[in-house]
Every structure is written in C-alpha cells, then in structure tokens.
Amino acid sequence: MQISDAEWQVMKIIWMQGEQTSTDLIKVLEKRFNWSKSTIQTLLARLVEKECLTREKQGKSFIYSALLTQEDSKKLLVQDIKDKVCSRRIKQLLADLIEECDFTLADLEGLEEVISKKKASAVTEVRCNCM
C-alpha cells in the first residue's frame, strides 16, 4: 500500500489526537499546510478507500478514525525504505538518521541492544537489491 506524504500528515494527526470530525481536520490541515478544503476531503477519501481510516456520519459531519495502526504504518515505512534504498546503503542511512535525530540516553542504549542482538546473525557481505 502506498501512502503519500500528505496522507501521512493526516494519519499523524489522527494517531496523535484520536478520532476527528471532518470539520476539525479541515481546520487543522488548512492552517498547518495551507491546503484547500477540497484537497483535504480528497486525502480523507483516499485514506478511507485504502482502508487506513474509517468514516462514520454523525449529524452534518463525518467522524474519522484510524484503521491503520502506527505499528503497521512503521512496517510499511520500513518496507518502503528497503524497496527504495540500495541494501548496501542502509547502514549509511541509519547512521545519518542517528546523527540527525535527537535521542535520549535510554533510546541510544536500546539501539545498542538491537545492534548487539543483530550481530549474532550478521552476514559476511550485504547483497545489492538494486537489480
């Protein structure tokens, strides 16, 4: 399933705030991204069609709720990166992310633990996935 950058922004708001009315989403997204009402309605319709959101009529508004969980979205994002980035470049991508992002000491210790466990199944050479 492909989710556009704009659709990710909509999902992030619903994950953070919980279910939202179309009116509330339009207000937030118009203000934050300067998107038109029709653009937002199109994004919402696409997310419903992709089964990322549910839509229920309530009075004059629709209520949108997330069907796609943040955990499932993380899996989609990881797969998307694996599909788009040469497998020989993943190490550098991870290093760049670590350099560019803020982490607590506990976060970094957790990353060290993941790396330690991964060493047990390390390969001698990473094969290119580009061809």
Q: Where are the language model's segments positioned?
A:
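Short, cationic-aromatic polyanion-contact patches
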Residues: 3-6, 58-77
